[in-house]
Amino acid sequence: SYCLKNYKELNNILKGFSIYQSNFEMKTGLINSILNSKLLYTHVVGHGLIINMKTLNELGNFNTKFWCEDIYLGLQLKFNNIKITPLLTLENMETPSSLENLIKQNSVWFKTTSQFSKIYKDIIKNYKVTNKLNGLIGCFNEFRCALNWIGFPIILLLSIIGALILKNYLIVLLIIASYLLYICINTKMTIKLINILDEQDYKTSLKIIFFAAIATVISNIGPIYSIISNKKVKHKTER
């Protein structure tokens, strides 16, 4: 899936987030699933999922104890050696129409991702599993995802600030140039894949890359909000 359905209606920051989320969806939902490595982070998306009903019932259907049932189900599949096979047909989804809604949506996802140890214990306790090690690797990947989500922007900004304090402007330029190159490659690959698989004609521009870079720098605002607010009731999200 990708998140450009309402792209033209969004402000520039949210356009950047639509690219950021599309980058993530294409990498973890498509590319990592095709590579089929237990060491890579993969996930399922409930509203685009095709699964045998008997298998789903054996797994206890969609879990509602944790806020994001897709993450829970994805880990259950790993615990039972059920391969996640991506469909080469993409769904074009909407990006939240306001920054507030996007933050709340991301906080819901992050809360479940960060509860990887609770999910592990819940699955082991309540369901039959066939491969604990594979499930443990899946939970570790959720930990890596949560750590990267909240930590990458912080490390990036601290690296730039540290180099500025030391007046090492060459390092500052190298960090910024490397980061922009990373965003540029990610965005171009994502747009190209979308155009091929969904027969679209999206264009990549410097403006798109710039706002995708801005969105990535502040992409941890949802996780930070989740930690600070520590909500006990799930936010109602747009998707």
Annotate the PLM regions.
Residues 51, 69, 87:
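A conserved hydrophobic position in a structured secondary element of the catalytic/binding core
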Residues 1-64, 107-110, 114, 118:
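Long helical/loop segments within the catalytic core of UDP-sugar-dependent glycosyltransferases
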Residues 128-150:
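Loop-to-transmembrane boundary segments
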Residues 87-102, 119:
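Active-site donor/metal-binding and catalytic loop motifs
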Residues 47, 67-72:
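Conserved glycosyltransferase catalytic-site signature
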Residues 112-133, 222-229:
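C-terminal, non-catalytic tails of nucleotide-sugar-dependent glycosyltransferases
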Residues 144-230:
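Membrane-embedded multi-pass helical conduit in multi-pass membrane proteins
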Residues 65, 74-92:
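Catalytic donor-sugar/metal-binding loop of nucleotide-sugar-dependent glycosyltransferases
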